[in-house]
Amino acid sequence: MKSFDEMTPKEIVQELDKYIVGQYEAKKAVAIAVRNRIRRQKLPEEWRKEVLPKNILMIGPTGVGKTEIARRLAQLSGSPFLKVEATRFTEVGYVGKNVDSMIRDLVEISVNMVKQEKIKEVERQAEELVEERILDALVPESKAMPVVTNPFINLITGGQQQQYTPEDRRRFRAKREEMREKLRKGELEDEEIEIELEETVSPFMGIFGPGMEDLGIEITNMFSGMLPKRKKKRKMKVSEARKVLLPLEAEKLIDMDKVVQEALDRAQNRGIIFIDEIDKIAGKESAVGPDVSRQGVQRDLLPIVEGTTIMTKYGPVRTDFILFIAAGAFHVSRPSDLIPELQGRFPIRVELSPLTEEDFVRILKEPENAIIKQYQALLSTEGVELVFTEDGIREMARIAYQLNQRLENIGARRLYTVAEKVLEEISFEAPDIPEKRVVVDAEYVRRRLEKIVQDEDLSAYIL
């Protein structure tokens, strides 16, 4: 498979097609946006500074694939990705999260992403170090070899001095190698050992109330270098110790300065921030009520989307080249209700179409992570073969579509509630049913859902 940087916009859309049904225009827009980033990297330095990303505004009802398109694109490109709700933020000066926090969160995600990649690179070395630490706990040197007391040294030092004969050392090494062999064969996984770990203490976290968690984290990080690191001995099985020690030993092998440097570069040049529910902060200007704060959030958002420098605990971060994708249903408000300056910062507008009954059929069958494939995989662990007939799939799609028309339209999310109700009995009885092949056809779907669908009160609560 090609690396992402070599993929054309058409190939990016084809990859997104594996997970998201329809919405071609939205896929096309994001594919062009990320491809332009790769093109920008190939430009001379003076041009690179001038070419800014074209931010995208997605307009469409809930459950049609807005978030999923952005998330899958980030996974495909290996970009740091953050999803935020515009309604979570408050204007500077009000209690709540400031919009600046989204950049800090993106950098944190980027650092963790790069750190995990570097840990993967040194995993083999870390496994060897973990093996040594487990062997130290299984065969402690002091217990493996007897103490030989030298009376002359005792007179000088005033205490006992451990001295080991060559024979003692040979026996110790032989015992250690014997245990190493057993460890590698997996014979000691349930053996209990005692290991020493550094205790992580966050004394400031409990002081700060809701909306001030960021401040608590910053103060904890600031004082973490000054506070003494407490060590605590813990008893655990070898299998558990391996999981605990592996990331600790791997972290010692990686250069955190290089990790931070690469993470900052990745966040600044490849970061994607998805701002959901932007329609909820749009509205006509008003001097009173909640609209004041909404206008304030838009004004606070503007410099970040335009390009500014935000201070984070890892260093300053420029937001000029971060790709912002905003999304909203815009049932009540319109994109023109956003402040004009913010409208201008989202030049690419894409309208996502509501899902049809035929789309629901395709969503159930086609994506690589399709709902029915997930249930088939889950129940196969109990030895149950789950078979969906074509008419069964179409009946589930029909009912989901009808419910969306009658009740609140929640898009493809309705399929999850319908599928869960259809397969509830099988999921419950799976370990005990004698017939391990279950066929889900239209008759089966109707039998499971008919009463609930007909009773509007029931369907409003259950489906």
Swiss-Prot record:
Q: Where in the cell is it found?
A: Cytoplasm
MF terms from GO for this chain are:
ATP binding; ATP hydrolysis activity; peptidase activity; proteasome-activating activity
The UniProt note on temperature reads: Optimum temperature is 75 degrees Celsius.
Give the binding site residues for ATP: 21, 63-68, 276, 341, 413
- Subunit text: A double ring-shaped homohexamer of HslV is capped on each side by a ring-shaped HslU homohexamer. The assembly of the HslU/HslV complex is dependent on binding of ATP.
Entry-linked NCBIfam families: hslU, PRK05201.1
Which family is it part of? Belongs to the ClpX chaperone family. HslU subfamily.
User: What protein name is recorded for this chain?
Assistant: ATP-dependent protease ATPase subunit HslU
Organism of provenance: Thermotoga maritima (strain ATCC 43589 / DSM 3109 / JCM 10099 / NBRC 100826 / MSB8)
Tell me the gene name. Answer: hslU
